[in-house]
């Protein structure tokens, strides 16, 4: 008899889990409280497909991102954007030295070239290392349309909040990201040790070919292309893009967005002077859920509680691990739950 499985949350992780379970013949119901799939953190981010360069203080995060890379590229090959120069630079006030950063890259096994971006793109004061890398991004629109196509056969229920009813389901998968603790609490499962951030990502336009610029590893800033959109870019500042943070679930604040965006551009222009001449084009807002830790790790993990062996909680890490998580959950359900606690995918 086919198992009936409820997946809560249709972000990229929930969608991939539902797709993979549906492939093997399970009856899958995918709930999403929004009117469409992938409308929050799956969309409202830097669209970076992590090779690991972003996490010099967490080798595990870098290696897990690489481990999931092949499955991500195979499933979403049409959404990959890679034909642009991408630079990772080290600041003298970084959390890691340039030597430590290079040692990290070599340990993880990610390739790079020593090269600086053109002078008009970067204020080189206090930058002691620049690497040109081949790390790609994804185009959200193509990614979403690919996911929608793959979801055929899944019982997708949009604009539907989880009401706590789990009668008749063999397994329940909580992949609701920023609502993960709310769902766990509804079902009497332990909450994860998370912090929640209200995040703003400014969007700007400039007549320039796509490029990526990231200064590591501290209160600096990063610029990435906005998928395949011509002359559009995303700006993120680790300090000023995070409007508020709490260990309790929070909502997007009512603070003046123009004021917040001004702070981001003002500080980022110290590193990228050309930002003073770009055309601002709005922003993205979302709530981000991150694990509380000391080393900046962003691992994808699964949690199974002794009292709820058929209830799996997903802590979503880097996007490249979405299929890896889906395969692991498929294996758990096929073989039965044999492990309780935390599973690093």
What are these regions (language model features)?
Residues 4-29:
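N-terminal Rossmann-like FAD-binding beta1-loop-alpha1 element of flavoenzymes
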Residues 23-43:
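Glycine-rich FAD pyrophosphate-binding loop
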Residues 38, 170-216, 226-231, 275:
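Central helical "cap/lid" subdomain
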Residues 46-121, 125-127:
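Dinucleotide-binding Rossmann-like beta1-alpha1 core, especially the glycine-rich loop
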Residues 80-91, 114-151, 308-316:
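Helix-loop-beta segment of a Rossmann-like dinucleotide-binding subdomain
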Residues 131-167, 171-184, 322-328:
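Helical element adjacent to the flavin cofactor pocket in flavoenzyme catalytic cores
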Residues 229, 243, 247-287:
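Flavin-binding catalytic cores
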Residues 270-345:
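C-terminal catalytic lobe of FAD-dependent flavoproteins
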């Amino acid at each position: 008899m086919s198992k009936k499985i409820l997946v809560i949350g249709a972000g990229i992780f929930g969608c991939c889990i539902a797709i993979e379970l549906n492939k093997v013949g399970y009856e899958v119901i995918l709930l999403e409280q929004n009117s469409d799939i992938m409308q929050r953190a799956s969309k409202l981010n830097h669209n970076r497909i992590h090779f690991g360069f972003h996490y010099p203080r967490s080798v595990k995060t870098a290696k897990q991102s690489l481990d999931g890379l092949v499955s991500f590229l195979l499933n979403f090959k049409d959404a990959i954007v890679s034909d642009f120069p991408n630079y990772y630079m080290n600041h003298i006030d970084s959390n890691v030295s340039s030597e430590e950063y290079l040692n990290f890259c070599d340990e993880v096994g990610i390739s790079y070239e020593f090269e600086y971006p053109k002078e008009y793109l970067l204020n080189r004061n206090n930058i002691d290392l620049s690497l040109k890398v081949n790390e790609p991004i994804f185009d959200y629109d193509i990614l979403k349309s690919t996911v929608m196509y793959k979801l055929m056969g899944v019982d997708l229920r949009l604009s539907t909040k989880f009401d706590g009813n789990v009668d008749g389901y063999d397994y329940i998968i909580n992949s609701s990201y920023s609502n993960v603790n709310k769902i766990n609490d509804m079902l009497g499962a332990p909450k994860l040790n998370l912090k929640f951030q209200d995040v703003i990502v400014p969007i700007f336009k400039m007549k320039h070919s796509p490029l990526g610029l990231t200064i590591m590893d501290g209160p600096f800033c990063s610029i990435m292309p906005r998928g395949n959109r011509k002359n559009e870019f995303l700006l993120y500042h680790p300090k000023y893009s995070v409007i508020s943070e709490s260990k309790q679930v929070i909502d997007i604040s009512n603070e003046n967005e123009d004021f917040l965006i001004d702070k981001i551009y003002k500080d980022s222009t110290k590193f990228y002077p050309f930002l003073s001449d770009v055309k601002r084009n709005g922003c993205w807002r979302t709530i981000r859920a991150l694990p509380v830790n000391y080393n900046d790790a962003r691992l994808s993990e699964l949690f199974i509680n002794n009292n709820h062996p058929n209830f799996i909680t997903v802590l979503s890490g880097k996007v490249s691990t979405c299929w890896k998580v889906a395969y692991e959950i498929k294996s758990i359900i096929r073989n039965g739950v044999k492990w309780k606690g935390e599973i690093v995918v």
